[in-house]
Design a protein with these regions (language model features):
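Phosphate/adenylate-binding glycine loop and adjacent helical scaffold
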Residues: 1-209, 281-287
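Accessory, usually C-terminal, subdomains that scaffold auxiliary metal cofactors
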Residues: 202-278
Length: 287
């Protein structure tokens, strides 16, 4: 059997991400948080995603989410915990993603044997995720496995996503790239407009400009804010190392299992993206 190389980790992430990430743009989840008193969309995002860690202080969310403006995190945390407990938010989150997946994919699709097979494969991969040095992954590993299969699949992909994300932050720290600098570098790649990255992470113009200045001093950006060859190489090294650190669960699953999981989840992710429900900002709850 041919073992996966590090690039398989990136392939898995790109295909599987919409199925997990839908929860952050779920109108059903936002309505559930609002019913608990968390009516602010950004607050719902911070609180629901960090809820597996418990009612943590703002500093923990700043550390683990990494690229969001500190002031925005402090606006939301710990205020959220006075409105709703982590346990209640986790329940609303699971109910919300259940509702969103049923609305977008339909009961027939989520009840199909393909989804059950995908859940089994994803759970097998997630079993190889270790908690050491990966706090968000560790929190999700401690949660009970939900049923039915479409929720088990979502939970497994959430563990795998946080495992990769925690590793990515470790790579950024090792290269001395702070959260705002990481956003600037991402924007300079041209894949996502810089303005969207800045606004979605609540970064001020002053913070953004200072990050650009620091990257120019390192010769990673030129005078027009474009990536230099040095900057492009540095960012690519972070992405490559992220893939390496994310590889363990995919090695455990093996190449045939990885390929099959992507094959099974690809049409689900495509349907989620095509539904228009996958975006850059948490939704506002319905009025």
């Amino acid at each position: 059997m041919t073992a996966p190389d590090a690039t398989i980790a990136r392939k898995q992430h790109r295909t599987l991400e919409p199925y997990h990430g839908l929860v952050y743009f779920s109108a059903e989840a936002a309505a559930g948080y609002a019913a608990l008193g968390v009516t602010d969309g950004q607050m719902g995002y911070f609180a629901s995603r960090s809820a597996p860690l418990g009612a943590v202080p703002a500093e923990v969310v700043i550390a683990t989410f990494y690229n969001f403006a500190e002031a925005e995190v402090r606006r939301c945390i710990p205020t959220a915990w006075a409105l709703a407990s982590p346990g209640d938010l986790l329940e609303a989150r699971l109910d919300g993603i259940d509702g969103s997946l049923r609305r977008i994919l339909g009961d027939e699709v989520i009840g199909a044997t393909d989804v059950a097979e995908a859940a089994e494969l994803a759970q097998r991969a997630a079993a190889a995720c270790t908690p050491q040095g990966r706090p968000l992954c560790a929190g999700h590993l401690a949660l009970p496995w939900p049923e039915p299969a479409h929720l088990r699949l979502w939970h497994a992909l959430s563990i795998l996503r946080e495992h990769r994300g925690d590793g990515h932050i470790a790579c950024l720290v090792e290269r001395e790239v702070d959260g705002c600098e990481a956003l600037v570098l991402h924007g300079a790649m041209g894949e996502v407009p810089a303005a969207i990255l800045q606004s979605s992470r609540a970064r001020t113009d002053e913070e953004w400009g200072a990050a650009v200045d620091r990257l120019q001093q390192r010769h990673w950006l030129d005078g027009q804010g474009r990536l230099t060859e040095l900057g492009r190489s540095a960012r690519q090294s972070v992405e490559d190392r992220t893939d390496q650190l994310a590889l363990a669960p995919w090695l455990h699953l093996g190449r045939p299992g990885c390929d099959r999981l992507r094959q099974l989840v690809r049409p689900l992710s495509r349907a989620i993206v095509e539904s228009g429900s996958f975006g850059f900002r948490p939704p506002r709850p319905p009025s």
